[in-house]
């Protein structure tokens, strides 16, 4: 009896993006399983193949992945745990999707036990692009800035902040990266410098219910327009938050969690004049 097996010529490179078809299905293998199995060929040709005992060839599936971008992202991550993804903001085309640590889809079946029972920190089968949740860090300052602009549409350009490298409020301190002092800054400069002190200061002035509403407009605590399995991003701060939580949340720390894919969607919507294209 002839045994058929899938071959994945790029090994780990497209492990999470393309997925695997042994021990279940993931990635494109799962999304396009029906297309890969059915045959739209000539009816007579398919009938003759069936009579001859030959297997009908399934349909082809063409992805949007860019091999060069995928290789660059894969190499840039090196041995670090993490994720890299890119999309065309104007169309929604996913151009690359890399998650590490990865695995070889050619050997999933034989290595299944070690993959699911191995070092939990490795979590090689986890697609960190869509399923990993992390503090957004300075990327959240986009939301803090946007909420401030909404609340002060005619005056946000007048904002000034003198950064000494440490922003002290009550008994709390927020430090800029390497305690770097940015000096006197306006709103745009504070954003360009990703000044922690300035954005912690901005956060204290915001309507917290409005900030939460904005976060949910940008799909925190909401379903994402994705076909792949994903983890829902989380924004917890509400109007009853204390000062420390406000300071932390305003600069992307605290309890806020986001997936790399969700972050990519937000950035793509901004790059596309506020319009989010459905990723594919």
Regions found by a protein language model. Give the residues of each.
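Beta-lactam-recognizing serine transpeptidase/beta-lactamase-like catalytic domain environment
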Residues: 90-138, 143-280
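Short hydrophobic alpha-helical segments used for membrane anchoring or interfacial signaling
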Residues: 84-89
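Extracytoplasmic/periplasmic proteins that interact with beta-lactams or build/remodel peptidoglycan
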Residues: 1-83, 97-128, 133, 280
């Amino acid at each position: 009896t002839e045994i058929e097996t899938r071959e994945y010529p790029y090994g780990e490179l497209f492990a999470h993006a393309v997925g695997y078809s042994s021990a279940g299905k993931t990635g494109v293998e799962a999304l396009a399983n029906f297309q890969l199995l059915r045959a739209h060929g000539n009816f007579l040709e398919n009938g003759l193949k069936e009579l001859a005992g030959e297997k009908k060839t399934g349909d082809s599936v063409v992805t949007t992945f860019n091999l060069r971008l995928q290789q660059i992202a894969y190499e840039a991550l090196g041995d670090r745990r993490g994720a890299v993804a890119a999309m065309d903001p104007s169309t929604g085309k996913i151009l690359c999707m890399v998650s590490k640590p990865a695995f070889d889809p050619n050997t999933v079946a034989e290595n299944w036990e070690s993959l699911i029972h191995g070092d939990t920190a490795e979590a090689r089968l986890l697609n960190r692009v869509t399923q990993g949740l992390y503090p957004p860090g300075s990327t959240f300052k986009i939301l803090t800035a946007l909420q401030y602009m909404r609340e002060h549409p005619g005056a946000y350009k007048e904002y000034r902040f003198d950064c000494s490298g440490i922003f002290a409020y009550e008994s709390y301190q927020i430090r800029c990266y390497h305690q770097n002092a940015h000096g006197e800054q306006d709103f745009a400069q504070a954003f360009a410098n990703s000044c922690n002190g300035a954005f912690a200061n901005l956060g204290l002035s915001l309507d917290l219910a409005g900030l939460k509403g904005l976060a949910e407009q940008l799909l925190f605590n909401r379903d994402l327009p994705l076909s792949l399995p994903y983890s829902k991003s989380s924004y917890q701060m509400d109007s009853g938050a204390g000062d420390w939580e406000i300071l932390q949340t305003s600069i992307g720390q605290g309890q806020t969690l986001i997936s790399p894919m969700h972050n990519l969607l937000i950035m793509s919507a901004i790059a596309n004049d506020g319009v989010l294209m459905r990723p594919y």
